[in-house]
A protein has these predicted regions:
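Anionic-ligand binding patches
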Residues: 2-11, 17-201
Length: 201
């Protein structure tokens, strides 16, 4: 796969430190991963799409237009089957405030209190790569699991302490290496890279 010149510097359309760390861990050996703030874009981009894909595209497009450089963005969240896919695109602000992980987890537990195990669901990440003068690439990655009855683990962020993945551990218990090998974000990024590879073949 060609990964020189045009994509050597890749701006992540986020200032979320946790997401940036994951993007860098997954893509850092291929590209110089830069946050949008470090690229000179300091904005709170309005995510008004109704799907993960729309929101990811909105963010990547905004940063690409501001910088003229390739930008990658994700929009991710948790879909719980017993809640008809909620919290979904509202995962980060499920409790009504943006980014309050504790309150979001509390509300999720409350809304699932009468639901027996297995409480199935999945993490979803839509990844959008937007480049000047080229068609955007948007792909989705998922990671199936179960929602536990109480938090486990000290790592991760978001709903990670309640999300038990295929290893039997929560995303807050697994190592960063394990999470980055199986996560929804990794799978979405790999799907984008595969499409990019086809385009450049």
């Amino acid at each position: 796969m060609e990964n020189t010149k045009e994509l050597e510097r890749l701006i992540v359309a986020s200032n979320n430190k946790n997401k940036l760390r994951e993007f860098d861990a997954i893509l850092g050996h291929l590209y110089s991963v830069v946050s949008m703030r470090d690229a000179g874009v300091d904005a709170d981009i309005e995510e008004n799409g109704v799907t993960f894909e729309e929101n990811a595209l909105i963010k990547a497009q905004y940063v690409m237009e501001k910088t003229g450089c390739a930008a990658i963005a994700d929009d991710s969240g948790l879909e719980v089957d017993a809640l008809n896919g909620a919290p979904g695109v509202y995962s980060a602000r499920y409790c009504g405030r943006h980014g309050d992980d504790e309150a979001n987890n509390d509300l999720l537990l409350e809304n699932l209190k009468d639901v027996p195990a297995p409480r199935t669901g999945r993490y979803v990440a839509a990844i959008a790569l937007v480049r000047p003068s080229k068609a955007p690439i948007v792909r989705r990655g998922t990671c199936d699991g179960e929602i536990l009855f109480e938090r486990r683990g000290q790592g991760g962020f978001g709903y990670d302490p309640l999300f038990q993945c295929e290893t039997g551990e929560t995303f807050a218990e697994v190592s960063m290496e394990t999470k980055n090998a199986i996560s929804h974000r990794k799978r979405g990024i790999v799907a984008v890279l595969e499409e990019l590879s086809k385009e450049q073949a």
